[in-house]
Amino acid sequence: MLGRTYMYMHNYTKAAEYLGKVIEQEGTLYELAGKYEDCFSDEYNNGKERVWEVQYLGGTTGKALGLSQSFSGWFIPSTLNKEKGDYAKLNGITFNGASSSIRASMSIAGDGVYETGDKRRDLTIVNNLYLDKSAPQADVYVVRKFLRAAKNAPTAVDEWGNNIPILRYTDVKLMYAEALNELDYATYLSTDILPIINDVRKRAGLSAKLSSDFADKQAVLDYLVKERFVEFSFEGIRWPDLIRWDLAEEAMATHFALVDEGYNETTEQPTYAMKSYNKLAPIPLSDILAYGNKDIMWQNDGY
């Protein structure tokens, strides 16, 4: 996590140092999971892919540490599981559903996001769902990534036992490759960066990249920006990634242009727009008052 923090600070020397300390333990403490779905299955809780994750225990109803979790269950369309009893009480959250409060960018399911043959696509999202008996609903997409109960099959929506990842070893390695690219693209491309990229691609069922595929430092970064999108989708790290790359405003402009309720037909422009100050969250008033000193703690600009 310290290595990730240094990445957010653009301190690539320190990031490479601390991420490298983790990679030095590959084979003993850490390694890439053999299959992408193993990164999320309860069968591999606390495995070598899992650097840090929230702990859960399947088969017990509850939402506290050490008990089952309901996070996975919220992604199941109830009409697909009517025979499961409690499942039918909650409808699965589709990430392009009617509620704007839960709407995610449809760009994750768009054409050209995943390379042809990338196993991660169908292991991450699913569409063409039979939400009724008449016909499949091709325009409905559900997150599949966290529906991984190999050991303890849940009998209720909140009885899932698969741990929720906070930091995966794949993330450590891709951040390390990115840090090395920022430090010295020419020196590290063939010896360190390319092997990491290809290890992740191999697991996804994709062919290896060559040094000639990356003409310069920017080409590597462009690849990693897209690769992190498909590898870590729905894991909660895309936003801080976009912030540190200074791509958040561009990404949100694209997002707001895609969602129906965010589009003004009169002006033919998105109704909503991210402001530059939104890159930082507002500081709670209670924290500001606790210090009572503007030189120590004050509100971020724009709020």
What are these model-predicted stretches?
Residues 1-23, 52, 118, 163-200, ...:
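Extended, hydrophobic/aromatic-rich amphipathic alpha-helical segments that build helical scaffolds
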Residues 21, 28-182, 248-303:
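Elongated scaffold/linker segments in the mid-to-C-terminal portions of large proteins
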Residues 189-289:
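A long, glycine-enriched binding/interface module in the latter
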Residues 10-14, 129-132, 205, 215-219:
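Generic structural signal for short, solvent-exposed loop/turn connectors between secondary structure elements
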Residues 26-27, 204:
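Alpha-helical junction/boundary sensor with strong preference for TPR arrays
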